[in-house]
């Protein structure tokens, strides 16, 4: 997973520029530059995601910590997040990860890679775990990884929760 992954939802423009269609910012990104989220990068006219499979935070949490009402009370979810965000909130409680890009230094061991199988094994360690919550930062900027992981986890009988800013 150490390699870059080509992003989904973008268009190629003249002059090797691209327009990212993942969020309403619709960033026009010149070669060598990143979008607002700090994780989607134009390399010679192809948009790549730099945070695919890269985890910055993981914890087993009570589902009640999520902004849900009466959703499997008393159960747990594996909460995980990456770096980057399409907002710049001054009050963000996870500023230290949400306002970093995938290429920025965060300290030793701050980002690590996790396969779907590894995440499934973490879910199975807690008997009352019902699934995964993609949280801590904006999960939609992690689109390719969240999509693949969510499908895998669902096929294994687990739930998926996205804690998103909705933009």
Which residue stretches match the model-derived regions?
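Flexible, acidic/Gly-rich N-terminal and inter-domain linker regions that tether
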Residues: 1-75
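Conserved Radical SAM active-site core
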Residues: 42-167
